[in-house]
Amino acid sequence: TEYLYEAAHQSLLSTEKFMLDGRHTGTGGGNHMVLGGATPADSPFLRRPDLLASLIAYWHNHPSLSYLFSGLFIGPTSQAPRVDEARNDQVYELEIAFAELQRQIDRLGGVGGVNVQPWLIDRILRNILIDVTGNTHRAEFCIDKLYSPDGPTGRLGLLELRGFEMPPHARMSLVQQLLLRALIAKFWKTPYTTRLTRWGTELHDRFLLGTFVQMDFDDVLGDLREAGFGFEPQWFAPHFSFRFPLVGELHAGGISLTVSGALEPWNVMGEEGGAGSTVRYVDSSVERLEVRVLGLNDNRHVVTVNGIPLPLQPTGRVGEYVAGVRFRAWAQSSALHPTIGVQAPLTIDLVDTWTGRALGGCQYHVAHPGGRSYETFPVNAYEAESRRRARFFTTGHTPGPMHVQVLERSLEFPFTLDLRRY
């Protein structure tokens, strides 16, 4: 892996990419992990069909594994949707498939039995590991090349994990590979049979915020340490900084407020006529931020965004609260709710309800605050950082007396303030 990254560098190719506004993003190329053996007979997933079931179930119960290493395009219509993002009843059907797989394994010789047909796992899971359109390739766990009886190219004993994006550094890729090897070794020894969680709307609410992804991923590392694999959280700190970049910080009245990037699923729009064909656009006009507050007195202080109170949720640590902000950042010609205008810049106020005034605040702009339009992409990380810093100010809070509205927490997304509803 390090050789490939170095060879790309020597060929004047870069593994880093920056958007016009300076955001650090993936290069667009897939970093799909392909697992298998030298021959189909050596594939661990054909020798132990329960191993794939363990991986799928563990990924399902730990959404951080799906979202920490993925690209910008996530959600039901992405290139690698989770099983429970495809259809509402897929988790129920997946449990039936796991039970049937185990029944067939027990009938044909038990775990590791030589009498288990190699095509068995393909037939049982093929119609579960799909996207909303039934595409078997566009799935988080792609088994097209595992052992499909349809043709020789499908009988290679290979499992493709598509929920990985190329990281900017070789060692970030290496630690991903190490994580996969450790999980496979763990489940080879002890199959994962825990009941599948019904995440519901929580999947696209709580687990799109970096704080809760970090908590869930810490549980994963804890499981690996109990199994004898000494993983340290610091090894994955670059991944969290890459996926949930720091936007800015504010300190006022003994309270610390941190704004970070968050994940946002992109929706595919309905069909429209294109140049000689039919096209379906992707709505990337909505963005999401995470606001984390430390030292807050929930009886006294309220955090508002454009005058709307945030539905802050406790993290389990005293005085620490987190919430997400979802807002229309860009005006696209094809988007959900096209009549809703751009809601940027965001003004985040830390309000003292006892005095009725803001202790301080900050502003976040999605583009240059002076209205300048960048014509070229950043040439390096320094220029990209300067563009990011130019869009956040620790000034500009709402002056004068403030009347805070009554907090209306969403029933479907209690961790998120969706400004499109206001």
Range-by-range predicted roles:
Residues 30-35:
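A short beta-strand motif that forms the metal-chelation/ATP-contact edge
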Residues 1-27, 38-422:
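C-terminal accessory/tail domains of diverse enzymes
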